[in-house]
Amino acid sequence: MASLIYRQLLANSYAVDLSDEIDIIGSEKTQNVTINPGPFAQTGYAPVNWGPGETNDSTTIEPILDGPYPPTTFNPPTGYWMLLSPLEAGVVVEGTNNSDRWLATILIEPNVAAETRTYTLFGVQEQISISNTSSTKWKFVDLVKTSLTGTYSQYGPLLSDTKLYGAMKYSGRIYTYEGETPNAATGYYSTTNYDSVNMTAFCDFYIIPRSQESTCTNYINNGLPPIQNTRNVVPVSLASRAIISHRAQANEDIIVSQTSLWKEMQYNRDITIRFKFANAIVKSGGLGYKWSEISFKPANYQYTYVRDGEEVTAHTTCSVNGINDFSYNGGSLPTDFGISRYEVIKENSYVYVDYWDDSQAFRNMVYVRSLAADLNSVMCTGGSYNFALPVGQWPVMTGGAVSLHSAGVTLSTQFTDFVSLNSLRFRFRLSVEEPPFSIVRTRISGLYGLPAADPNNGNEYYEIAGRFSLISLVPSNDDYQTPIMNSVTVRQDLERQLGELREEFNALSQEIAMSQLVDLALLPLDMFSMFSGIKSTIDAAKSMATNVMKKFKKSSLASSVSTLTDSLSDAASSMTRNSSIRSVGSSISAWTDVSSQLTDASASTSTIATQTATISRRLRLKEIATQTEGMNFDDISAAVLKTKIDRSVQISPSTLPDIVTEASEKFIPNRAYRVINNDEVFEAGMDGRFFAYRVETFEEIPFDVQRFADLVTDSPVISAIIDFKTLKNLNDNYGITRDQAFNLLRSDPRVLREFINQDNPIIRNRIEQLILQCRL
């Protein structure tokens, strides 16, 4: 079977231990390094964590505690607390709507027996009976009357040792504090025309927004934090804090500081950013009515423009993040139009534009601080794409629009065909605009966002104007260039090659013939037959095989096998020490990792889906350890890998180890496994879905997790190449015999080839879906 390649890599990965030890011996050296931090260091140590520095944004930050303000009469805005801080007993604050509510608050010192005092309330002398029996706490009392000539009633006393009180107008009410510190809480009085109530404060006060009410309550109960006193307190409009003063010219280079070897340069630049989107439209195999993918791809664009009379050559790379996956299924027939996945960018997405030009600002862009940018917005509208069907009217994806708004700037690196460029990455947030997009002649309409079908709408590029400023640490001699670690550049170049190779591999999926794939999956592929398509010498082939094994040794599959081996060893040793432990239980613990959950069902909080998913993650390892005669997912994975390696024009010895390792981990992520017990089948997927059914009728039966775990230990595990839903669909539409059902359940390659040669659309579609899952 083709999966022999994975078994061989797992079995022989120890062969690279010697070369690893040699590399470790050569690299584990110590040497003394003396660092002279120079005048640009923040401390006595070397400079650390150079980054993009400050980044402007449009957020206005409202202060939590605004003040103090002197006694005054004014109409406070609704939704803001007045935090009053009186120094002595007497009237604290008063307010009225001049119709049906007069509210005043007085403060009484501790240890006051019942007596009558005279207070001036709203300009009138009033006799009020008061008392405060507390020996340590001051007492705030609300005095309320409902008519101009009425008498005052006392409400909402607050006993406080902080001498702080609060009042707020909000939602048709006047809110105050009541109770006793440190457990005081808010209360309220209903009133009409509350928004026109003028408040007169007889002491210093602060303003706190309602969004920070918890902080205000904390102040009431525990007191204010330490505040520096000033001699002159002048209220200032909050809007003045948002004013930013720009004193720099549009385009200039300023020396901020300089020593003999290094200098800090501030670069201010006007820029014109031009970018475009790229996309990939992949058609599925078959009769020509299905599309597998319509996706965004990174797009490079090079152009020139004039800045201050100087011609500038610029390079941009546009990419997207946070895409939304949509699909359309017109029906189950092979001639029904369908799109497996098409990407749309919306308000939860981001667009990244990496910008570089040939000016001095980008020559030494390695150590940068105080990076800021200010850019305009731009509208991007979608065009039309015709889905060319063999017969019938063509569906058309048309419309869609988003606007891009600047959301920040950071440093980045662009990769061209010849060189890597240190550049600026401008991040744009999106908002959806009119018109929505639709697929004409389908039920898809009125959706918002920009689909990947034709994002440029015939435009050569989109354009944004703006400016940026940064301070860069550069050599004092302009002829020198800041050194960059070569190893980083090499690794980044390898990542670029791997990215291109992954794209090529994914695009080759639709070109694989299924009948040839099944034949190839049955061949016993070893390492050298797998890599025979790569042009290289024998010595290079040996080195390449070693590199593949070295990389594969660190894969998640190899790590899982190692962990499983340790678990089985522990289970065996435990069984030897204690004869009362069942061997089946020990095996379950090693293979499924859920025996403890099954021991005490009442204490288990896991759902059946969680338990079956836990077991399913180990079933691939059980299948590798106990190979059956049927075809498995790794056979298909290895066959697809071999086919793509032979057809690839970009594969090389440097990229092969990463590709083989990724294929073992990422090909066919949605796997399902089954065990057969007489006429009953238990099937569980790695996504938590599970089925139990009878072979005779394909009728579902209750799923017993305990029994499934026991069968996993004692019975062979089989890859569900043809899963339960496909089998049931096949039986309902075509009818299959009992023998055919058992052969499909066992993934018999002979029966699979029969159905494929008969051009059975259900089986072909299932195999097509497995091939399309072989993506990197």
Swiss-Prot record:
Assigned GO CC terms: host cell endoplasmic reticulum-Golgi intermediate compartment; host cell plasma membrane; host cell rough endoplasmic reticulum; host cytoskeleton; membrane; viral outer capsid
One example of a Gene Ontology biological process annotation: virion attachment to host cell
Swiss-Prot/TrEMBL site (Binding to sialic acid) positions: 101, 190
Motif interval(s): YGL motif: 448-450
Region (Hydrophobic): 389-409
Span of the annotated motif DGE motif: 308-310
Coiled-coil segments on the chain, per record: 484-511
Keyword Disulfide bond: yes
Annotated stretches, region: Spike foot: 510-776
Region (Spike head): 65-224
Disulphide connectivity of cysteines: 203-216, 318-380
Keywords for this protein: Capsid protein, Coiled coil, Disulfide bond, Hemagglutinin, Host cell membrane, Host cytoplasm, Host cytoskeleton, Host endoplasmic reticulum, Host membrane, Host-virus interaction, Membrane, Outer capsid protein, Viral attachment to host cell, Viral penetration into host cytoplasm, Viral penetration via permeabilization of host membrane, Virion, Virus entry into host cell
KID motif, short sequence motif: residues: 644-646
Pfam families: Rota_VP4_MID, VP4_haemagglut, VP4_helical
Family named by the database record: Belongs to the rotavirus VP4 family.
Protein name: Outer capsid protein VP4
Source species: Rotavirus A (isolate RVA/Monkey/United States/TUCH/2003/G3P[24]) (RV-A)
